[in-house]
Regions:
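Active-site microenvironments in enzyme catalytic cores
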Residues: 1-11, 16-193
Length: 194
């Protein structure tokens, strides 16, 4: 199932994209915190504005240095840097990114984002699947010159630095260890990784 958050010109709503279709079935409720059910409303994908599929209630937690050209066994990997993105950095997939005037080195990187379905803390690795709602795409926009000699959040947390979406893929059988991530800049492929 693919869950979208969108607006048809009124208040934002959640919906489920019908498989193999451009129709969205409206949902009542918030899939991140409560069970949902069909609202009876049907929307066409090309008639709505897609919003960020997630409204962060707290923060976006990022893990740095998560790509490698050489596979490294999990137990041999160094502790990765952790950084935060403010909830004001989150925007929808088609919203404009406001490049900060104070930076001369802004870059982007496509990322796989894990969507947590409820507030969670101190979750063990074995219990992690129980708190995962699904996955979406994130654009990790970074002002690299603001990170020099300081915390990563300085360069990663400015307003609009975290486009998400277009939807949350909910599939417990999804093998996230074997997904392709491609990013494009002005129609040209800029990233192709997994």
């Amino acid at each position: 199932m693919r869950i979208a958050r969108f607006s048809d010109g009124t208040n934002p709503v959640y919906g489920a994209l019908e498989e193999g279709s451009t129709r969205i079935v409206g949902l009542k409720g918030d899939p991140l915190f409560s069970p949902v059910e069909p609202s009876g409303q049907i929307y066409e994908l090309d008639e709505v504005r897609l919003l960020s599929p997630v409204i962060p209630r707290s923060k976006v937690v990022g893990i740095g240095n998560n790509y490698s050209d050489t596979p490294i066994p999990v137990d041999e990997r160094p502790e990765p840097p952790i950084f935060l993105k403010a909830n004001t950095s989150v925007i929808g997939p088609d919203d404009p990114i406001a490049i900060p005037a104070w930076s001369n080195d802004v870059v982007f990187e496509g990322e796989l984002a894990i969507v947590i379905k409820s507030l969670a803390k101190n979750v063990s690795a074995s219990d992690a699947p129980q708190v995962i709602l699904g996955y979406t795409v994130a654009n990790d926009v970074t002002a690299r010159d603001a990170m020099t000699g300081g915390p990563w959040s300085r360069g990663k947390s400015f307003d609009t630095a975290c486009p998400l979406g277009p939807w949350i893929t909910v599939d417990p059988q999804l093998d996230v260890t074997n997904l392709a991530i491609r990013s494009y800049l002005n129609g040209e492929k800029a990233q192709d990784s997994s």
